[in-house]
UniProtKB/Swiss-Prot annotation:
EC number: 2.7.7.27
Family as reported in the entry's similarity comment: Belongs to the bacterial/plant glucose-1-phosphate adenylyltransferase family.
Binding site for alpha-D-glucose 1-phosphate: Y100, G165, E182, K183, S200
GO terms assigned for molecular function: ATP binding; glucose-1-phosphate adenylyltransferase activity
Source lineage: Bacteria, Bacillati, Actinomycetota, Actinomycetes, Bifidobacteriales
Biological source species: Bifidobacterium animalis subsp. lactis (strain AD011)
Task of the protein: Involved in the biosynthesis of ADP-glucose, a building block required for the elongation reactions to produce glycogen. Catalyzes the reaction between ATP and alpha-D-glucose 1-phosphate (G1P) to produce pyrophosphate and ADP-Glc.
Protein name as it appears in the record: Glucose-1-phosphate adenylyltransferase
Amino acid sequence: MAKKNPKILSIVLAGGEGTRLMPLTRDRAKPAVPFGGVYRLIDFPLSNLVNSGYSQVIVLTQYKSHSLDRHISQLWRFSTLLGNYVSPVPAQQRLGKHWYLGSADAVYQTINIIEDVQPDIVVIVGADHVYRMDFEQMVNQHIESGAEFTVAGIRQPIEQSSQFGVIEVDPEHPNMIKSFQEKPKETTGLPDNPNEILASMGNYVANTDALFNALSIDSKAENTKHDMGGDIAPFFAERNEAGVYDFSRNEIPGATTTDHAYWRDVGTIRQFYDAHMDLISYIPEFNLYNMEWPIYTSSGNLPPAKFVHAAGDRIGHATDSIVSPGVIVSGGEIHHSVISPNVRVHSWSQVNDSILFDNVEINRRARVNRAILDKNVVLTENSTVGLDVEHDLARGFTVTSDGITVVPKGTVVDD
């Protein structure tokens, strides 16, 4: 059992390739994908950990990690004199001539770092979800329950069970896990709601010695994917040593009734798009403006956004939108969209229901609808994106089954 006031080391699993987010992950790791105008996905778990009081953090990176490493190094600077740090740790082939074989193997390959720190408890979190969470509350329950390993759980629709680890709770001990299935094709719903499951959020708390033992056994096993959800969580569940933390009980200062216990997986283009649309209503599903639990980032030394021209049909304006620093809307129109820094929207152009990454330029009379434009995309005069699916596909753009067009980084759209 972990002691009270334990020493905590946090590990962020940031080595994911993010193939379902292509082409947004063509040139960057999934946790480095921009989100919400000025953030990157990695900012959400790191902000949650730091706001929880946990400031000894290592970030395990692997896939196309340059921009991610640079972002962490520039933003997350702590005073090492106080023993605080957020350190990116790339895959190092420390235990063999292979890269990370899975999330569990990634943690196992950092055992030397864990041994140097000598924590009582290890907090392990993913790097690609959008949410606020006080991890101290989860750690406190972990200690009180006597579990060796605790999984954070959230209710999700049963039809999404194949996307998550599914938790069955022990009815006699509601804080303990009876069974854990990773992405089952079929499962049963919860006793109080057969249309829902209790899904793993990919966040774990573990006693260090027990975690070492499980990872060591897993490293030698043959029938394993070396995965935290698929292998380590079931390992503890089978031994009646796994607890579950109900995320709906997590209380965040400044949270509203609307965004209490908000959590989104943004692993697909549609999920990524929908999570952005959650940000921009009058009472947003997820409130970026809660300064009692801030999401930290750095948008550089940029000037304020500017809107110019106000004559006839040439009016620079934005409605129901997030507009970031450095943006100039010069006689163009933006509606229901998220606009990242240094974007230019020129006269008589229109941007609707879209997400624009940094340094995008929308020239005169160009139109964008229901699209995601990666960094440095340029639309020439009179060009369009998102108005004709067949035309978008013919130009090599990604178009989802529900009509969201994605334009890769650096593309010049000239027709």
